[in-house]
Amino acid sequence: MRDGWGGGRLSCVIALLGTVAAGCGEPGPTPEDAKAFVERAEEQLLELWIDAGRAAWVQNTYITDDTNILAAEAQATVIGATMALAAEAAQFDAVDLPEDLRRSLLMLKTSLGVAAPSDPTLQAELAVISTGMESTYGRGEYCPDNAEACLSLPQMERLFAESRNTDELLDIWAGWRMVSPPMRGQYARFVELANAGASDLGFADLGEMWRAGYDMSPDEFVAELERLWGQVRPLYEALHCHVRAELAEEYGSAVVLPGQPIPAHLLGNMWSQTWANVYDIVGPARADPGYDLTRLLESNRVDELEMVRYGERFFDSLGFAPLPETFWDRSLFLEPGDRDVVCHASAWDLDYESDVRIKMCIGRNGEDFVTIHHELGHNYYQRAYRGQSPLHRTSANDGFHEGIGDTIALSITPEYLVEVGLLETAPPADRDLGLLLRVA
């Protein structure tokens, strides 16, 4: 009986000890812990984003080996901190969180445009490669045979918009693209490192990471994109067919092959983004928009800075506050003659509060007039979300910023040009077809 009693007591004691041990273990993370983590991460990242943004601005507007190094170091710091925080955030994967908090953790993971592996050495390598390629692009120029001087990208863009000599256009198109072959090895390594970084964050590759930022699964995003493209595809196939036929009539079937893709160098835009600059060739006979915006700017003696003022007044008319003086003091509006810069137009938010700027080498033409309104659309959107928490001081998704900019650009209608005094009278409604084709 003693043995039986003692064995029973011992079993109870062991069971009790096991219960106590389980009860005294470390508690798992809670939603409150996740909220505190996000707030701490935002505070840390905001400071790093500001530092990296300033370094990137200097590097974009004053390209030297030294500014490349400074920008790469700042970018590597952001990458390292973000990857470390993303790894720390994994502790909340199994926690039942409110949807907004769960989304904040996903935004933390995807806040890097390009992820990098967890290894600090590889993070630094990726930052150097990224900055170096951007610098190469910004410094890019083409030196035609027997030319007195090399051509910068803005100079090539002007020639591309105005020339109708197919040999010259093809020469410029191919010449500009000689800037990229030296980056081939760098780019391949860039993709390798970025895919490895995305994998460390739990994604299959960088593409899946990018597709994860639209409040749906990456596969759902692909399906939605295909659905939307299916809606507009018939229209764009018809438009491209028309443009190809008009270009073939202008240049001949030996240059524009029937049934083949439109030759990229014939569209008047270095990246084949629009056909507005060749509208005189591709526009229907009775669909003249009734005005040429470039000529309107010239006849009204509107210089490059005044073009930006027109953009600001557009937003003034909608009730927005004027741009701060720092915008005018710190933006880059003209291509400088004493240094290399990245001329490609972009909008910047340097301190996530009020230090907004644009960077572009403005030409006095209609295309850049529209681009200015587009870029300012980004700036005013940036000002609109500055009261949000740091992770939410960004576009609702990667496409929304461009949607804002393009919506503003589409507002540059004949009626608007009349209102601001650039055009005397708006063309009749039957000219709308030409206007729509130009912006399609």
Which ranges hold each PLM region?
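C-terminal motif of bacterial Sec signal peptides marking the signal peptidase cleavage site
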Residues: V20-G23
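N-terminal helix-rich structural modules
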Residues: E26-R189, G207
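Secondary-structure transition/capping motifs at alpha-helix termini
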Residues: D316-E325, D351-E353, N365, N379-L391, ...
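Active-site-proximal, well-structured secondary-structure segments within enzyme catalytic domains
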Residues: E148-Q155, R189-K359, P428-V439
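Post-HExxH zinc-binding segment in Zn-dependent metallohydrolases
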Residues: L225-L235, S395-L437
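Active-site recognition of the HExxH zinc-binding catalytic motif
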Residues: E367-R383, E402-D406
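Bacterial N-terminal signal peptides that target proteins for export
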Residues: M1-V13
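Hydrophobic alpha-helical scaffolding
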Residues: D119, S180-R184, V222, W229, ...
